[in-house]
């Protein structure tokens, strides 16, 4: 890392990577931003285009297309490269294809002398974050996946819409796999300072079956978007930006990232979406929510599915 200069390297300039890159320039988060892609011309073109937006950014950012060698002085490497999810394909269906790609990418990055933090977004994100941790040899705290940050954002947006409340005042989490086995933590959902269950008990117009439908829409949101426009990228781009800001600004923010469990929630040796405190060192600590029995069972099932899917590719 270069003292006093925040450098972020993005590996993968597809739709997700470029949405993240645009968000980064739009908010002026890093002083140096490097784009790397197997398609060098694409990375170069994106860097040129982004550079032309810098005069409108809140703060200047030096943007260029580079190579894995640029990772040597990076504080953060964000990986969005990999094969995208096709219509009808689950995130877990991608595991074998993207694991092979990822191992090559991580080795190339580590050969540069990189000693910063990894942030992974490629699906299946929990498994590929684990693969990155194993391949890199970095401390578990410095390998993070986007986890259920986007799912939690979708959850808060839809709950806010249903209750007619600013989603920024909705405090609710989706945990587990970023995918079909994820689960809502209803027992800890609050609107402002009031428990969601209290609001339901005191207002006849709000019903649990409506909330259950909201969760189904959260869980299946990616499928719905992919069916209509081919891919999701704005939401995950902003999610990655949020985690990036928490890291570079040493915020100690609580975000539902994919973090390594070693006994928390009764699970170990798995990366999975849970609330965690994020700062300049990566994951400072995991926030262990007291789940009810139903939530515990669903969380255990989610981790079990991840481990079973991951086993053949490790």
UniProtKB/Swiss-Prot annotation:
Record's keyword annotation contains Phosphoprotein: yes
Activity regulation, per record: Allosterically activated by fructose 1,6-bisphosphate (FBP).
Amino-acid positions noted as binding NAD(+) in the UniProt annotation, renumbered to this chain: 16, 37, 42, 68, 82-83, 121-123, 146
Catalytic activity: (S)-lactate + NAD(+) = pyruvate + NADH + H(+)
Domain of life: Bacteria
EC category: oxidoreductase
Ranges in a coiled coil: none
GO cellular component: cytoplasm
GO MF annotation, one: L-lactate dehydrogenase activity
Positions with a binding annotation for beta-D-fructose 1,6-bisphosphate: 156, 171
Modified residues annotated as Phosphotyrosine in this record: 223
EC number: 1.1.1.27
Primary site of residence: cytoplasm
Residue positions binding substrate: 85, 91, 123-126, 151-154, 232
Entry annotation: catalytic residues: 178 (proton acceptor)
Pathway linked to the protein: Fermentation; pyruvate fermentation to lactate; (S)-lactate from pyruvate: step 1/1
Gene Ontology biological process terms, A to Z: glycolytic process; lactate metabolic process; pyruvate metabolic process
Subcellular location: Cytoplasm
Subunit structure: Homotetramer.
Function of the molecule: Catalyzes the conversion of lactate to pyruvate.
Record's protein name: L-lactate dehydrogenase 2
UniProt source species: Bacillus cereus (strain ATCC 14579 / DSM 31 / CCUG 7414 / JCM 2152 / NBRC 15305 / NCIMB 9373 / NCTC 2599 / NRRL B-3711)
